Amino acid sequence: MAQEEIQKPTASVPVVKEETPAPVKEVEVPVTTEKAVAAPAPEATEEKVVSEVAVPETEVTAVKEEEVATGKEILQSESFKEEGYLASELQEAEKNALAELKELVREALNKREFTAPPPPPAPVKEEKVEEKKTEETEEKKEEVKTEEKSLEAETKEEEKSAAPATVETKKEEILAAPAPIVAETKKEETPVAPAPVETKPAAPVVAETKKEEILPAAPVTTETKVEEKVVPVETTPAAPVTTETKEEEKAAPVTTETKEEEKAAPGETKKEEKATASTQVKRASKFIKDIFVSVTTSEKKKEEEKPAVVTIEKAFAADQEEETKTVEAVEESIVSITLPETAAYVEPEEVSIWGIPLLEDERSDVILLKFLRARDFKVKEAFTMLKNTVQWRKENKIDDLVSEDLEGSEFEKLVFTHGVDKQGHVVIYSSYGEFQNKEIFSDKEKLSKFLKWRIQFQEKCVRSLDFSPEAKSSFVFVSDFRNAPGLGQRALWQFIKRAVKQFEDNYPEFVAKELFINVPWWYIPYYKTFGSIITSPRTRSKMVLSGPSKSAETIFKYVAPEVVPVKYGGLSKDSPFTVEDGVTEAVVKSTSKYTIDLPATEGSTLSWELRVLGADVSYGAQFEPSNEASYTVIVSKNRKVGLTDEPVITDSFKASEAGKVVITIDNQTFKKKKVLYRSKTQA
C-alpha cells in the first residue's frame, strides 16, 4: 500500500554531467526521454512532483535520449540519501527535541499514561477548566460589584425618600402642633370678632400656643432621632449617622426661633389690639414655612454625608466577601493540583513498539526520531502521535496479529517484497490493478480482510528491520498503476485513502522513496488526487511519477536492473518454486569448500534457490556437460556474499546438452555455515 505523496512538476533544468559538482543525495534527477526534471532540495517547503510523462522535445532532451539509450544516464544518476539517525548527524535543535521527547515519554511511563486512551491534549482541558473557574469568579465579582452598586443606589434612593419622609413627619408634627392653636384661635376669635372686649383672652391663647409648641418641640427631635435610628439600621452604620443627626439637630434652632417669634407675636398682639385673627394665622404659617426651609436644608446636609459612610462600610464588606471568594477559589485550585501528588506510587509502565522499548535502548532513539520527523520536530505533536500509535496497536492487538495465521494467498500478487535497492532498502511492490479483481474485492468484508492482511504484512516487514542508528530502517515502495481503478470508483478510492492514512499515522517515516509507475497519461493532470490520498508533506516530497514508457528507467535509477522483476523491465525472474518444493540442508565446515551437484537433461531449464545462514562466504556455479569433449560453461562467477546482500540467491540455467550444474560454497571463516537450497527442472 503506497504511503507516499505527490509533488508538483517543476520546470525542466538541463543536466550537464561534466559540470555537476558532488551531488547532494537528497536532490532528485529523474530520468526522462523528453524532459529532465530537477527537484529542489528537501529543505524547501514546496511539494515536489517529478513527472516522467512525455513532454515536447527539445535539443537538451534529445541528448538525454542518447544518454539513456547508451545506459550512461542510469549509471551516473545519483540515488537519494536518507536522513541519518546517528547522533553525529543530528543538528543541535534536533538533539534538544529528542531529549525533550524522551523526557515526556519517561514521565508518561511513570504515570502509566500509555495504558489509558490518551485524551486529546489533557493539560489544555485543565487549563480551560481553571480559566473557566477564574472567569466564573471574575464574573461573580463583577455581579457582586454591580449588586453592591445597585444596592447603594437603592439605599441612596431609600435614604432620599426616607429623608423627605422624615421631613414630612416633622412637617406633620409641626403642623400637628400648631393645628390646635389655629383651631383654638379661630374658635376664640369668632366670639372675639363682634366684641373687642374679648381680645384679652388672646394672651392666654398665645401662652397656650407657647406651651403647646414647646411641648411638641422636644418630641419632634426625639421622634426624628428614633426615625433616623431606624433608617440606618438597614445600612448597618447606625452610630455615626445618629451622632451627626444629633449634632445637626442640636445646631438647628427650630424651637428657639419659634419661641422668640411666638413671644414677639403676643407682644404685637398686645400693641396692635385691632389686628384680626387672620394676621396671626398668616404669621404662624410663615413661621412654619421658615421651619420647613431650615429642616430641609439640614436634612439635605445629612443626606450628603450619610451615603459616604454607608458606601465605605459596604465597600469594606464587599472586599471581605471578595477575599473569602478568592480564598475559596484558591483552595479549590490547590485541591485539584495536590490530588495527583497524594496519589500512591505506581510502577513505571513498560511499552514497546515493533519489539523495541520506547526508552533505554539505542534503537529507541531511531523510533522516537521517526515520530519527531513526521511532525517536523514539534515535540508535543510527536508525543501525541506516539501515544495514539501505542493505543491503536493495543486496540487492534497488533502484536498478536503478527503470529496469527491469516488466509491471504490471493493477496500475494497485490503486495510483495522483491530484492533491495542500491542503498540496501527492501523494495515493496504494490499492484493497484489487482483491485479490479471482483473475486477478491467485491464487498466490504473482503476489503476488511485485505486490510487486516496488509497490516500483518507491514508489521512483519517492519519487524525484520534493524533499527540500529547506522542501519536502513525504511523501505522503497513501487506502486504500479497499470489497470488501476478509474476515478469513477469512488468507494474503492475512499477505502485506499483510509488505509493509507492509517499507515501514515501508525508507521511514520518508513518510506525512503515512493515510485508511481505506469501512470496513465490522463492521470497526470489529476495528480492532486494522489495528494488527497497521501496527506503528509514529507511523504509527498519523496514521490516520483512516471508514465508507462519511462517506468523501467525510473526504477533502474534506484534499483539495479538484475534485482527488478521481469514484469517491470528488469532481469529478475519470478520464482518457479512453490511451498510444496522441499528444501535440502547442508553444513559447510570452517575453512573449507562445499559443492552441490544438480543434474540437468538436454533442453531443460534448471532453477535453484540457495541461502547461507550467516553469509560471509563465496558463491559460484558452472555447467559441466556429460560429454568430456564439450566445454564447461560458467553460470555465475565466484562472488562474495556478505551480510548486507540479498539473503536468498536465485539462479537458473538452460542446458543445451545433458550434464550437471556444480555450485561451490567457499567458507574461509573459522565458523561453520548452514546452507539451505532447493532446485527444480522444467522442460
Curated annotation (Swiss-Prot):
CDD domains: SEC14. The modification N-acetylalanine is found at A2. There is a cross-link at K394 (Glycyl lysine isopeptide (Lys-Gly) (interchain with G-Cter in ubiquitin)). Residues 404-576 form the CRAL-TRIO domain. InterPro entries: CRAL-TRIO_dom, CRAL-TRIO_dom_sf, CRAL/TRIO_N_dom, CRAL/TRIO_N_dom_sf, GOLD_dom, GOLD_dom_sf, PATL, PATL1-6_C_GOLD. Belongs to the patellin family. This is Patellin-2. The gene is PATL2.
